[in-house]
Amino acid sequence: MSLISAVEDRDIHNIGKTSGGGSRTSSITSSKKSLKHGSKSLRKPKVYQTTGELLSREALYKAKLKYGVYQSPAQSYSIGVSDAHAASDKAANLAHDNQTTVEAYKRMFIDPNATKAASKMGPKVVRNNSITSATSKTSKESQTKRKSKESPGAAASKAYSMTMETTSLSSQTNSRSYSITSASSVLSGASGSFNSTVNPKPKTLNLEKVLVGAEKKAESRIKERWEPEKTNFQYGVKTDEHGNLNQFSFSNEMMNNIMAKVDAPKAQDLQKVKKVSAEKEAKSMKFALGAANAVKDMHPGEDIDKSIALKAQKRETYLSQLTSQQVLTLARANVDRQLDIIEKSDMHRKLFTNMEYNKAAVAVAQSNHQKKTEFHNKINMGGGLFLSPEDITKIASGLISPVLGEVSERAEAQRAMDEEIAERTEAYNKSLNEWETMERSIISNDAKVLTTTANRHQTEKKTSQEKIKASFDALVARMDTKVAERETLLEDTKSKEIEFKKQMQQELKDEKARLDQDLEEWGKKCEQDITEARKEQEELLKPYHDDLANAEAEHKTLVEERDAINAEISRLQDAIVDHKRKISGYGNDLDAQKNRNIREDDKLLELGQTKESLESHLNDDVIILANKAKEQAELSTKEARLKQLEVDSLINERKSELNATDIELKKEKLSLLEAMKDVASARGDDKIDEEKVKKLIGMTSEEYLTQNKSVEKNVEDLPTQLEKIEEGDELKKEEIVGAETKNSGGDGVPVSTAAKEATETSSAVQTKEPEEKISIGNKSSGKEDANDCKSAEHSKEISVSQKAGNNKSLGVSPDSLEHTFSGFSQGSSIEDDQDAISNQEKK
């Protein structure tokens, strides 16, 4: 974890661009500007430790080295012009060409004719505006001063501000006249750009003031470069290590000595060297102490990143080179050589720095200027127009004052906004400081509370331990007295116990003899009761065992019938497939016979055969059709039989399930009765509680036995009824086959009627056969209803499902039988269609 938060890229960029002469106020103004524009709020880094104390300078220095924000000459940008030889000339040219007071309001797109007309009608045309009336002379002067201060790159305005400090009030009025003349020169230059035929006169220039300002500015820039101020970066704690980057202070005296190539005395050099060495020792001691304090919080076992170590080594070598005497001597020699080259190559220096020549030139210029009495104190506006400064001032006030008034209003509004933002930031910082103090107080209070509670707990613990010890001592004394009393009592009880044991042994012997005699008599009586109870239990449970054996036998017969039905179903399916194959063969024979008939018809037309031969061929066709109808009838009957067998198999499965449940129920009842018998025998009762049996089973044991006897008779009659039903089905099949053979073999009956009768008989067989089965099913269900209530409900469900299975075959064509059979084979239940079958029965 770092000691301070990382600096963002935009902050590093701003740090690199700050000049050496800047101070901490630049960071404050930049933060205010950022708040004013509302771009992003600067986040202050954490420069405090977790305990609330400030970080040391060594910690801040290491953190800056870590994040690469340490201010050094290698990271600072160059200030000033690119060519050092032409620095003074560049400053003079900038001061001459820069026109900050008029440039912002110059209108380049105005027609020159309109400018001439406005200048001629200047005194008459005056704009009355509330904004211009509100502005006073003092506000204008303050605006001009503020503009001259706010223009950062105007060397002339800075030189003008420097000269104002030394000149008197008359020079201030002259400087104002120069500003008006500069405005007029700009206006004349603009008009001259539009009208190239007029040659403007050369501009007047006070070279003395410009050169003095340029020299001062150049001197200040050189001083800033040689003695850069160590900035405090906008972040961290402010330190007092400013101005220690260089050992020498390049003052005016030093610069004069350098320019004059005069060496300093050796004694002064020795004194400076001693002073520097003493300062170095003090610094080294201070840094060693700081490093020792900083090393306490560091981990010596951790490895430093190679890149960071390499950067730190390069920075140390660079800083050591900056403070070495060899570098300084080489730099001084380079500066001397460069100054010599500048003096030799700079021809303008001989011209502009020669005061006598400049004075003579100024005197000549003034004499030439005084000769022009006609245009004295007037400005050439171009096109032969000369105006006085007062007229130009009026025209400029008419054009510029509204704009200046609006600018002043906006500036005042912006100023008020800046003040409000500053107040808000101050209030926010104040509240933040209060909150931080509150947090610190909370932390300290928490620590105090912890210490106080710990002390209180210790005191309470001591007092409670003392109380417990005292109570324990009292308890021990009290218990000792009780133990002594109990020991005496124990001795008395032991003596009494011995006497009581002797007495009880004698009583136990007598009681044991009496109990042995009673037990022998009671055992004989219990054996006699058990034999009698077992006989009664066997008599009562005999019908239940018989009922269970009959139910198991019935279940076995039903399973065998189901297997027989499944075998019959598989046989009928094979027969159906065989009949379908024969029908397809008969169809092919019919197609072949049709083709043969066509050929025979053609032959009859050609050869004229007799009628008998043709009828013989037609009789063959009729025989084939009869055989086809016969096979279709057999197929329909077998499909109906298959469907009925499917229904019977479902009924048998349901009956087997019902019998299984009945068997389980009877087993449970049997186990219940056996349990009740055991309970009664254990209690010594002769009979079972009949009321309890009636509550559990719904009837008494005698009623249950009589009912089970009737159920046994019905179970014995069931296989005889099934055999009768199967015999009736076989007789009906034989009758249908005989009728078909008679119809197919008759000579006098036509083929169409024979086929119709075969289909009708098959449908009649289909309708009669289920009706008889329904009646038989109803009879059997009626018998079962008379016997048992619970078995009646199951038998009703079976009879209804049987009716549903039989009624589904009523009025169904042979084509639809295969579909319904496939539905049954897929496992469709019969009970789901009971409502539809009941509606069909009503119809």
From Swiss-Prot:
Pfam families recorded: Eisosome1
Entry function: Required for normal formation of eisosomes, large cytoplasmic protein assemblies that localize to specialized domains on plasma membrane and mark the site of endocytosis.
Subcellular location: Cytoplasmic granule; Cell membrane
GO cellular component terms, semicolon-separated: plasma membrane
GO terms of biological process kind: eisosome assembly
Topology in membrane: Peripheral membrane protein
Residue list for modification Phosphoserine: 2, 88, 130, 182, 401, 584, 710, 763, 775, 816, 828-829, 838
Biased composition (Polar residues): 127-137, 163-174, 798-810
Comp. bias intervals (Basic and acidic residues): 781-797
Annotated positions of the Phosphothreonine modification: 720
Region called Disordered, residue ranges: 13-44, 120-174, 717-843
Organism for this UniProt entry: Saccharomyces cerevisiae (strain Lalvin EC1118 / Prise de mousse) (Baker's yeast)
Segments of skewed composition (Low complexity): 752-764
Keywords on record: Acetylation, Cell membrane, Membrane, Phosphoprotein
Family under the similarity heading: Belongs to the EIS1 family.
Origin superkingdom: Eukaryota
InterPro entries the UniProt entry points to: Eisosome1
Compositional bias per record (Basic residues), positions renumbered to this chain: 33-44
Residues carrying N-acetylserine: 2
Protein's recorded name: Eisosome protein 1
